[in-house]
Every structure is written in structure tokens, then in C-alpha cells.
Swiss-Prot record:
Its EC number is 4.2.1.24. One of its GO terms (biological process) is protoporphyrinogen IX biosynthetic process. InterPro entries: ALAD (IPR001731), ALAD_AS (IPR030656), Aldolase_TIM (IPR013785). It is found in: Plastid, Chloroplast. It catalyses: 2 5-aminolevulinate = porphobilinogen + 2 H2O + H(+). The active site is at residues 294, 347. Belongs to the ALAD family. This is Delta-aminolevulinic acid dehydratase, chloroplastic. PROSITE patterns: D_ALA_DEHYDRATASE (PS00169). Catalyzes an early step in the biosynthesis of tetrapyrroles. Binds two molecules of 5-aminolevulinate per subunit, each at a distinct site, and catalyzes their condensation to form porphobilinogen. Keywords: Allosteric enzyme, Chlorophyll biosynthesis, Chloroplast, Heme biosynthesis, Lyase, Magnesium, Metal-binding, Plastid, Porphyrin biosynthesis, Transit peptide. Binds 2 magnesium ions per monomer. The first magnesium ion is required for catalysis. The second functions as allosteric activator. It comes from Hordeum vulgare.
Amino acid sequence: MASTVPFSPAKVQMFQATNCHGHAGFGSSFAVPRTGPRPRSVAVRVSSEQEAAATVRAPSGRSIEECEADAVAGRFPAPSCVCQTPKAPDGTPEIRPLDMAKRPRRNRRSPALRAAFQETSISPANLVLPLFIHEGEEDAPIGAMPGCFRLGWQHGLLAEVYKARDVGVNSFVLFPKVPDALKSPTGVEAYNDNGLVPRTIRLLKDKFPDIIVYTDVALDPYSSDGHDGIVRKDGVILNDETVYQLCKQAVSQARAGADVVSPSNMMDGRVGAIRSALDAEGFNDVSIMSYTAKYASSFYGPFREALDSNPRFGDKKTYQMNPANYREALLETAADEAEGADILLVKPGLPYLDIIRLSRDNSALPIAAYQVSGEYSMIKAGGALNMIDEEKVMMESLMCLRRAGADVILTYFARQPPAVLCGMGTAK
């Protein structure tokens, strides 16, 4: 008889994964390059003797046909072993099993089953890495945030982005540490086209054209008063005048190449005004991630140290939300969605899981959560004191944010979950 088998003289190049994309299922694909002509079919004559020698036999030496005949006749081999239930410890009461049709533990009894039925997952696509930047060349550690630095806006910044991309993280949000000499009551440095943030955006987009760059739209890093808006002589934060400045800031960032502008200041009407300003300048494709439910939280302390942006007087309770309020988030969600927001963000994250779920249930827009500096520092401190397992608590906290309904998470841990999922341990 004649059999047709493929024959190819081509040499196939070896390939291997260079990072966790290759072995963690993060959406990577590999093309196997070939050289030489296309494979062709060659007829090979097989003799009857060769065909008989190729008859497949079971490990016992008997052919498949013989085994099938035994099965039809009801002759089955004896099992090699009989599985027995392990013995319970002495003193365990002997009882009749409970009469239950449903036992949820059945679906949790092995790692394979638990993985098969897991409802929530985390991937690098769900993570956004915040980056603190400053004008200096050297990276400066942030005391209240172990492992975080104010990055030199060129070398240190690029190194951090390279590390994140190595584990599949391609989204970044920028927060500038602005010199005091550039701060003013009206925050005019916020829309300087040659300022720190626009220069950083251009640098990143030149080196990594495919990354997603989020920017913060707020005056507090640029304000000599440390507030998110212009402060009147009597201490009142001016809303509409601040929104005017924010529009110029957002346009400046979009002009530099920002993909997503993120108004975090909680001024009324800011989203609609920024959307109109962007569209008027031709930036119809630039998205807006609104800090929809940003609470006046005590969890922001380390962040404000990182940027030296603490209010010089008072607090931010006249514009940020009361932590005691739940229904108010519905008002903010409806307003921002109507004004043209593309993404709705809840901040802080873990203490406000109910607000994340509320937003998820009441909007079809993507929901973001910010695991803020205080949440990060608590986990780091607990791990350093060996009071908790830092890696496990970090993963659980992020999984909880995803389970509550967050599509994306802004977190200072962003480089670590992909490394953990790859089996490489916490990224350094």
C-alpha cells in the first residue's frame, strides 16, 4: 500500500519566550519562521511485512483488537490498586453522612477544580502603573512609600517603563513633583507646553509608541496653596475659574500625546468643559477618565508627601466627597457620564468596594479603581514587620478590586502581579 507523508527540507528556527508573556497566557502569540521551499508530499511504498510490524500493541503485548474482544466479552483486567479513603484521626465520631444534594465544597476540593471555576482574574492589561517624576536626573526614594521613587524624568523613568513592559504592563499615569519656584496661586505651570509632564509624554511616546499614557488634570501640584483649585482671599475654592485652567491643562497634555486625561480635582462641570475643549482643538480621540467618586480620604498621606502637595491651609472637603456618603456617588456617576466621561474612577480602592460595585451596576462605562498610597504603604509595612504575607495580601487586595467591578486598577504594585502569576515571585 502507499502512504502519503509530508516531507520538508526546511529548517525551522528555534524560539523561546523572553518574558512572562510566553508562559503565563497573557495574550502573546509566536510566529514560527520557516526558510526554504514550501513542504511537498512524497509517496512512500510500505510493504505488507512492514505494515504488520507496525501493528500497535498495548503495554501487555496484546493488540488493540484483542483488548477490544476481551472488553466485549466482559473480561476486564483487575485494577492495579483500590483507592481507599484515608483514615480519620482517632476520636472522630462515626456518623451517617448528612443528607445533602448540594455540597459546594465539591467544586473546591482540588487546585485544578478551583482554577476551572475561578470567576475573577487579573492580567497586566488590567493594571496601570503610577509614575512619580521630577526634574532631577537621579531617582529619589519616597520615605512613606517603600519601593517607590521620584524618577529622573529621563533615565530612571525609562528604566521603570522598561521593567513594567517586560511583565506586560503597558499603561502608565504621570504625577509630577513641581519645583516650588514654578508654583503659583493660579497654577499656570500646569499648561506650559514645555513643562515636566508634556516633555515626559513626548519622551515616552517617542520611545514606546504603543503604550497608554494617562495624565492627571489638577492644579494641586502646581498651586502655591496646595489645593486642587484657585483659592479666593477668603479661602473659598473657585469652581468655574479653576475649570477654565483645567481645560488648558488637558489640551496641553493632549497636544503632547496623552492618550487619556484624568481630571482628579472634583470641580463641578469639569468633564463636560474638558470634553468640549479637547474636541475644539481636534483631540476627539483623547479619552477622559474622570475621578468620579474621589473621597476626602485619610489614605492619601504618602502620595502628598511624594509630590509635596499638601494643602497649605484647611482641607479638601468642600470639593472631595464625604467618606460617609454612598448615594452621592450616583449623582457624580450620572453627571460625569452625561458630560462625556469615557472611564469612571473610584478613589480610594479597597475601603470603597461598595462604591465600585455601585458604579459598576449603574453604568456601562469602564470602571477604574485607584489603590492609593495609604493602601500600598500599609501592605508594605505589614510585610516588612512579618505581620502579613505581603505578596498574598497584595494579590488578594487587587483581586477584590476586580471582583467588585473594576476593569482597570491604578496601583503602585502594578509590576508585581504579572511576575507572581508567571511564577517568578515579586518583581524587583
